[in-house]
Curated annotation (Swiss-Prot):
It catalyses: N-terminal N-formyl-L-methionyl-[peptide] + H2O = N-terminal L-methionyl-[peptide] + formate. One of its GO terms (biological process) is translation. This is Peptide deformylase 1. Binds 1 Fe(2+) ion. Belongs to the polypeptide deformylase family. CDD domains: Pep_deformylase (cd00487). It comes from Gloeobacter violaceus (strain ATCC 29082 / PCC 7421). Its EC number is 3.5.1.88. Removes the formyl group from the N-terminal Met of newly synthesized proteins. Requires at least a dipeptide for an efficient rate of reaction. N-terminal L-methionine is a prerequisite for activity but the enzyme has broad specificity at other positions.
Length: 227
C-alpha cells in the first residue's frame, strides 16, 4: 500500500468557475492511497499543510484492517508523531500532512501543561494524555455541558480564537493494530478529540470560532490572556 495526494489539475490552478467549490469536495479533490507517498520518516518528510490547501476540506476516507497494518500507514503514523512533537502540538490529523484518511495522533505531554498556571490547568481541566492513535473515530457528545476557550491549529499557525466545545465526549475507534478502543474524555482532552476529528470531516477550528476573537498570538497575549 502506498500513499499520495492527487488533485485535478484545474483545482490546483484555479481554472474554471467551479474548480474549487467546497460542495464538490469529494469528486473535485480525490485523494488516493495507491501510489508513492510524498515522504515518510523512513525516506521523505510529511510536512504540515496550511489553511487554504484543499486537502483540509475533504471528508477523509476510512481505513480497513489490512490498510491499518500496512507498512505505509505505520510509517505515516510514525511521521505524524514526529511532526506533532516538532511543532509542538497536542494532536495531528492525517489531512494535516496531506493524506486524506481517517487517522489522528494525540499526545498532551506533561511539559506542555507545566507552562500553565495552576488556575489555568484547573479551569481547562487539563491533564497529561499519553501518545495514542485513533483510526476511523466516531465521536458522540455526552451531556449538555460546554466550555469556551481559545484554540489554535497547526494548520493555521500564529492565530487563536474562542471556540465552544462539548465538555464530555465518547469516541469509538480503532488503534494502530486495528483493535477497537473506546474513550470517554472530558475537559481539554475532549477538546483535542473534537478538534482532531473535525479535521477528518473537512472542518477547521475557525469554522466553529467566534471570529470577533480571532487573534494573532501576540495580540492574544496582549489583550485576551488572563482576561
Amino acid at each position: 500500500m502506498h500513499l499520495k495526494r492527487a488533485y485535478p489539475k484545474d483545482c490546483l490552478s484555479g481554472v474554471g468557475s467551479n474548480a474549487c467549490r467546497i460542495g464538490d469536495r469529494q469528486s473535485r479533490y480525490p485523494v488516493t492511497i495507491e501510489c508513492e507517498s510524498t515522504g515518510t520518516s523512513g525516506g521523505g518528510v510529511y510536512e504540515i499543510v496550511k489553511t487554504g490547501d484543499p486537502v483540509l476540506r475533504l471528508t477523509a476516507k476510512p481505513l480497513n484492517s489490512d490498510e491499518i497494518q500496512s507498512e505505509a500507514i505505520q510509517q505515516l503514523i510514525a511521521a505524524m508523531a514526529e511532526r506533532m512533537r516538532e511543532a509542538p502540538g497536542v494532536g495531528l490529523a492525517a489531512p494535516q500532512v496531506g493524506v486524506s484518511v481517517q487517522l489522528v495522533v494525540i499526545e498532551d505531554r506533561p511539559e506542555y501543561i507545566e507552562r500553565l498556571s495552576g488556575a489555568e490547568r484547573r479551569e481547562r481541566e487539563r491533564e497529561p494524555v499519553p501518545f495514542h492513535v485513533l483510526i476511523n473515530p466516531v465521536l458522540s457528545v455526552e451531556g449538555e455541558e460546554s466550555a469556551v476557550f481559545f484554540e489554535g491549529c497547526l494548520s493555521i499557525p500564529g492565530y487563536q480564537g474562542l471556540v465552544a466545545r462539548a465538555r464530555v465526549v465518547r469516541v469509538e475507534a480503532l488503534d494502530e493494530r486495528a483493535a477497537p478502543v473506546v474513550i470517554r474524555a472530558h475537559g481539554w482532552y475532549a477538546r483535542i478529540l473534537q478538534h482532531e476529528i473535525d479535521h477528518l470531516n473537512g472542518l477547521l477550528c475557525v469554522d466553529r470560532m467566534d471570529l470577533q476573537t480571532f487573534s494573532t498570538l501576540e495580540n492574544y497575549d496582549r489583550f485576551w490572556r488572563g482576561g
